[in-house]
Structures are given as structure tokens and as C-alpha cells.
Amino acid sequence: MIMTKQKNTLAERLNIGDEVRELKLGATFNPKNTSTAFHTIKYDFKPASVDTSRMASVDVGPNNQVTVIVPNSESSGVPHTVYKGNQREHAKECLMIYDKETGAITIEKLNHNIQVKKTRSEISSKSSHLPPQNAAIMQGQVPGQQISNGSGPSTNVASGHGPGSGAKLENSTMRITSKTKVSTGSRRNNIIDFKPRNSPMQQSSPSRPVAIHRSPQSAPAWDANNAQQTLPSIPMITDDDDFGLRAALHNGSQANTSGSSTGSAVGHSDYGSASSSSHMGKQRQAPHHGHAKRQQRSSPPMVQQQPNFGRNSYNGGNNYAQQQQHEQQRPSPYGHGNSMPMDLDSSRDHELTSKSVAHAAAVLEQQIGGALSASSSSSESDSSDSDSGSDSDDSTEDDRPSQQQQQHQHKAAQMHHQQQQQQQHHLQQQQQQQHFNQLPNLGLGSISPSYGNNHHQQQSRHHPHQQQQKQQSGIYASNGGFPNDLLQNDLQLSSNSSDEDDD
């Protein structure tokens, strides 16, 4: 295998010998030259179908825009390839031209450097008559408007468009840049009907569909004049949702009935009834702590009537009976077990107990009146006997048995008086016990023993204050007699006076 040496130097490629040759300056070095110019073209892609036997055309447009049309071979099916780009002036760069026939070498200045790229769009232009290309075009260098070979005649290159224009097609290698747009249809805005929420019960309903994607056009406009329309985030209690209001009224009625029952059963001063009602209110309101403010707002008129119940036991009983009738006439909001049981005959039972208490008080006053008359007669006899004994110092021994008999009678009267006081105290305790035992039968619920002990202690604490008020006011009992406290005070005074007489 014979290895051939590659020709690397320009002299070897041009077959130029070692002799010295003359270098000539071209017409571009003449400052008065306006007809000759040389340009260089650089393009990125050169298709294989370019016809090198024909001349290409260069068109310079505004703003240094250049269009280069290169003819293609007839077998390719596309007449030419179009390049577009811009031009830039050369600085201190020259072109050397070698003439093989004469061996002369000429140097010329380069005017512009044109850089173009293959276009991807179809362009219609006029066709031109392309003469045969010279050696410079075959080497890949496109000369300017005029090519000079030094001594021989110059050949003009057609840079314009000649006659015989026609439609020209583009190269088949041109890429298709049109993009296909897939229409997916317009976006549908599903308008969901918005209904104003009148109550939070509808908001928390599990069967109600939830609007996740809602168009802004479906949102209702806020109207300041419309009182029923509310914001979506603010629930409003209306006529449909009366659960909270009725529960508050129901709890308030329970507290009021408990306060009225304690006031009528105690039958003492305003302070005692107020303290007992407040104690009952605390016990009733302890499990319903969340509705305390609603109870206070919903039932202030009924609470204000509680201090008036303790002024008179019988008036308190009548007021309680009226309030029981009023509560019975009012329909219950709910039929389940949250409401307290109210007996229909509670007012009748209370009237019977009040009548029995009045009858027992009348019997006690009659017994106390008889005891007072006996004690007063015995005290008068004792005082007369003491006066007669002091006046007559000469009493005989026969009178001593009579004095002993009188003392014995006086002691018997005192014992009888003490027994009557014990019986009276026992009857009062029985009456109070009857009141406490009758309270559960009125349908107000059982009262705890702790409440009874505390209530009895409160009565015992405020008992002297109540006696002073009754003595100062002079209130009579319902049957026309004196109160029991005044009778007890008289009995104590009479017993003290009789004891002093015995001494």
C-alpha cells in the first residue's frame, strides 16, 4: 500500500514554485474606486443539492439585512435555498487572488462580512438568469459585484434580478414550523345556586351538598337593607332555630319556681328568702353553667318577685299558687325529660297545708291565752299573800299550811306553763318539718339534707332580727290574734315575774 503525502501548504495546493512573484494591488486600494468590492459570506448549513455550476444572488436590504439565494440542482426538486442574515464591515482584512493562467497574484481589500442562516419559511422572489460560475465561486467564496483577475478582462456578476421572473419553490429540507393548536373547548363555569343559610342547623346538616368550586359570579351581593340576609360565616338564630332561646327560658323558669317555693315555705323576712333563693339558684345553675347569662337575661322580672314572697307566709302561698297556675297554663316547649315534673294538684295541696297551719296556730293561741290567765291569777294571789304577810306580823302557825298549799299550786302552775312551752316548741318543729316534707310533693324535685341544715342554720341566725322586726311593726296574724313570738315573750316575762315573787 502506497502512502500519499497530504498537501498542507497553499503553494503545494496551487502548484506554485519557489520563484519570486510580483504582488499587485487591486482596485479596492484606490480611494476613487466605486465599482469594485469584495465580500465574504459565512453560512451555517450548506445542503448537498446546491448547484455549483450556477451563480447565486445577493440582495442587500435596509438596516444591513442580507438575503442570499443559492440555486439547487434540478434533480433535487427544489429550485433554490434561501439564506438570510446581516452584514458587517471588515477591518484590515484582505483577499489574495491567484491567476493560474498568468501566474499573477493580486491583493484586494474586503468590504463586508456577511453571516446568514437558512430560513424556514417559504419566500417567493423573481428568478434571474445565472451565468456560469468562475473558480472563485467554486471554492466557496462568493465575490462581490465585480471580480478582477488582475490583467484579464473582468467578469460582472449578476447581483440583481433579470427578466423572466417566475414562482420559485423552497428546498425540501426546510422544516415545517406551523404548530397545531388543539382546542380543548372553553372553560365551563359551573354556576351553583347559593341559598342563604337561615340557621346553623342547616349548615351542620350532613345531607346538604357542599359547594367546593364556586364561581365568583354566583356569590350573593350584600344588601345592607335586608335584615334577614347574613354573611356566610355568621350564623343567625331565627324563628326556625329556637332551641337556645327555649332552653334558656326553660332553665329560667326552673330557677324562678325553685326560688318562689323556698320563699313561700320559709315565710320569713326578705333577707332570708333572698338568701335561700340564691342558694337554690346556685344549686340549679351548677349543671347549666353555659346558660347562666341567658337565664339572667331572659327572666329578670320573675327573679325580682322573689324577695316579696317572704313577707307573709299566707300571701306567699297565694302568690305561689297563682304562679303555679301561670306555669301550668304556659305550654311546655319540649316533651322530653329535661323539663321538671309539675303536679297539677300542687296548688290545692299548698292551700290545704296553709289552712292546717292556720288552724294549729289558732289552737296554740287559745292554749297560751288560758295559760296566761292562770299564771296571772296565781301571780296576783301570790302578791296579795305577800302583802298581807308583810302587814300582819302576828300571823299564827295555822296560816302556814295555806301558804305551803299556795306555793305548791304556784309550782304546779309553773310546771304546767313549762310543759305548754315545750309542746308549743314541739308543734313549731313539726310544722317546719311538714313544710320541708311537703316541698318534694309539689313537683319541684327533692331537696338535699345539706340544704335543709343550711337553711335551718340561716333561720336560727336571723331569728332574733325577725323577732325585733315583728315587735316593732306589730303585725297581726291572719286570724286576728297576736303573733306567736309576742306570746312567747309575754310568757317569758310572766314566768320571770313569778320566779321573782317566789324568791
From Swiss-Prot:
Q: Transit peptide: present as a keyword of the record?
A: no
Q: Which UniProt keywords apply?
A: Activator, Developmental protein, Nucleus, Phosphoprotein, Transcription, Transcription regulation
Q: Name one GO biological process term.
A: positive regulation of DNA-templated transcription
- The protein depicted here goes by the name Ell-associated factor Eaf
In which residue ranges is the amino acid composition biased (Acidic residues)? 382-397
Q: Which residues carry this modification: Phosphoserine?
A: 199
Subcellular location, record wording: Nucleus
Native source species: Drosophila ananassae
Q: Which gene encodes it?
A: Eaf
> Which residue windows does the record flag with biased composition (Polar residues)?
143-158, 170-189, 251-264, 297-311
Q: Looking at the record, which segments are called Disordered?
A: 143-223, 251-503
Naming one, the record's GO cellular component terms include: super elongation complex
Does the record bear Transcription in its keywords?
yes
> Compositionally biased, Low complexity: which spans?
312-326, 415-435, 484-497
Q: What does this protein do?
A: Promotes transcriptional elongation by Su(Tpl)/ELL. Essential for development.
